[in-house]
Amino acid sequence: SRLLLNESGEGKVRFVEAPPERAPGLRSTGMVTGALWSDADGDGWIDLLVTHEWGPVKLFRNEKGTLVDVTEKSGLDKHLGWWNSITGGDPDNDGDIDYAVGNVGLNTKYHADPGHPVILYYGDYGDEGVKRLVEAKYENDEIVPARGKSCSTKAMPHLGKKFGTFHQFASATLPQIYTSECLSESVKLEANTLESGIFINDGKGGFSFRPLPSTAQSSAIFGLEFVEVDGDGKLDLYAVQNFSNPQFETPPFRGGLSVLLRGDGKGGFTMISHSESGLVVPTDGRALACSDLNGDGRPDFLVGINNGELLAFTNRRTPSAGVLRLQGEGGNPSVAGARVTLVSKDGTRMQEVYQGGGYLSQSTPTICLHSGVTRVEVVWPGGSSSSHPVDPATRETVISVPE
């Protein structure tokens, strides 16, 4: 992974790779699947969150221009997953940013918990002189192979000589098959959390994990987006699902139709039925972006399908209350990195402006308002702040960076 510094000048675009000391550990962070720039601890400096396959969601805290890995300190290190995606929002209305993360779900042949993770080894296990991948799992507190004798022997023929029958192979533990010495010299990766969920922020950059409802665990989640869809001022969550092409011995992760979850304003969610929402995506959903496609002030969705046509869903039910657009200048016209507090008689909710997130996606950098919003308070990327009244009769409210 690389951190690129923008050193563009007038009429010339130029990015330069940052020296390693600007982001220690980022180059070798692991198998990255997604990233989000967000102020996780509310100190005014934009931090970096990175999702991994076979690893945690890592937090690199921005300490005055240097990204420092504080994953362990934040509590994120406890949850190793096959994380696919990440987006930020304030579903519990407490003024800090929480993070929704997509994972493989609970409707697969894989099962894991903190004491019994699924495991992946990478090393040399025989006389072929080639490094191999070995999947492993727990059975009755013993580590055993996740793959059978036939495919294992095809990859490593020496196992056919060591285990003459299927019964012998099936009765052996992983160290008996590959030796403890070879396993100890291998790269070892684990996943102990397979649920998709929300990392709830304590306001200081510390996190606790809250799984999404069981209906959201029916399939792997990729694109996901916090959005207020029903006009009650509480953030909801929409996610697209499915993965049809695991290795041939594994059934497809294809039990989802996408999932729309209604937020309760306290960080909890309940399922909205597909018949009510009209959001049905039975194929392999990947990218998800939110935008006002028809200019009616309501949030709509664009869904990218793996090997399929782009889908568009227009919102017909949310009460239209207009949108907020921040107007920047220079190299940041959409004011990415701004933090906006929506103020209503029922309380406040924090929202950030992103330039990308979810699963390889970028939503329109506008904020859909609900009818109760009377004022917005903006913390601009440079650190200045301003407060602005909102007219509910205005279709689009535009606020420019103060001079």
List each model region and its residues.
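Acidic/hydrophobic-patterned starts of short beta strands in beta-sheet-rich repeat architectures
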Residues: G42-T51, N93-G102, G231-V240, G295-G304
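Conserved hydrophobic/aromatic "anchor" residues
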Residues: L4, F15-V16, A40, F60, ...
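Beta-propeller blade termini
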Residues: L5, V32-G42, W83-N93, G102, ...
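Gly/Ser/Thr/Pro-enriched helix-cap/hinge segments flanking short amphipathic alpha-helices
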Residues: T66, L106-I119, D127-E128, E135-Y138, ...
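Surface-exposed loop and turn segments in beta-propeller and other repeat-based domains
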Residues: P20-L26, K73-D77, A136-K161, G197, ...
